Amino acid sequence: MLPPLSSSPVQPNHPWRRWLLLSVGLGVAAVAGVLLWQQARQRRQVFVSITSWPANEYLYLAEQKQLGQPFGIDLRVKQSSSLEDQRLAFVRGDVNVMATTLPEAIAVCQEAPARCPELVLVMDESVGADRLIARQLLASPAALAGQRVGLERTVLAEYLLLRSLEGHPVDIEDLQLRFEGPVALVELMRAGAIDAVVSYPPYDFPLRQDKRFHEIFSSRLMPGEVVDVLAVAPETVRSHQREIQALVRTWWAAQAYARRHRSEAVGVMAQRQQISPEEFNQSEDRLRYPSASQQRSLLADDGPVAQTIERMAGLLRAARRIQPDAPLPRPTTALLADP
């Protein structure tokens, strides 16, 4: 028989052994807690203002699935009720990053030149999602003279209306404009209080199934002009480059997640928009998502986005919607990041 290793073996329930185990356990927990705290501190909160629009829901998906954490950020979306409310919040400095349209970015430069944003990512292009819908008796935009036309008080809505009237003997001053929020506009249209409306998903779904109405113009007829971008305040670009690059990577992570888990992702995004997954898929049929490899050419100094901004500004100046001497948003490739 082997002799005992000690003449006075330590019993499992000895008081100082329990104290030692407790001390070791507390030490391990403390170290783990410190590491988690340090990781949390290293993840910067990044707030992005969004409106109700199918492409913007990918940012919400990224927030819910914490897809920014591998890149060192904690993404938080801030919902705005309309493009106008979002733009005014950006002008005031309440938000520094927003997913918005080119016309709204142009408007920021008019209202607050010092806040004129830099455009760091092209999120999507509307290829028919933004629509001018009218009563069946109104066959084309030329028939809108003297009619009641509803739209949001946004530069995008006015721009789409101006583009629809090009080539027709009708000016925007010939229309009876009615300004309301996106939900109220659809209700006015269904009630017969207006004759045409500028609308988009998810708000336009009740009008799609109503045989009293039809589409007379859409962004499909103005390719490359209605795009959504990540617009960032210039001081934020200078002071938080790493976080903005991480945000761009998070966008690509959300796109990749949605490809891998399509049903789940669509369910999350559709529920937030209060539409069915089928309707969400339908709304995406009228969108195009540029790839990561296309971003550098899109955002080049003389690229498509810069050229579109110049064309838009020219039309808005001619319509006396903006001042001729204000700066314009600047596309930049400096903060592009690979997925």
Each language-model region and where it sits:
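Short, glycine-/small- and polar/acidic-enriched structural segments
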Residues: 33-171, 176-179, 195-199, 214-216, ...
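Pocket-lining segment of extracytoplasmic ligand-binding domains
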Residues: 102-104, 177-178, 183-273
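Hydrophobic membrane-insertion alpha-helices, especially the h-region
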Residues: 21-34
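Conserved C-terminal helix/tail region of periplasmic/extracytoplasmic solute-binding proteins
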Residues: 310-339
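Secondary-structure end/capping motifs
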Residues: 239-321
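N-terminal Lys/Arg-rich, disordered targeting/topogenic segments
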Residues: 1-14
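Twin-arginine (Tat) signal peptide motif
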Residues: 13-21
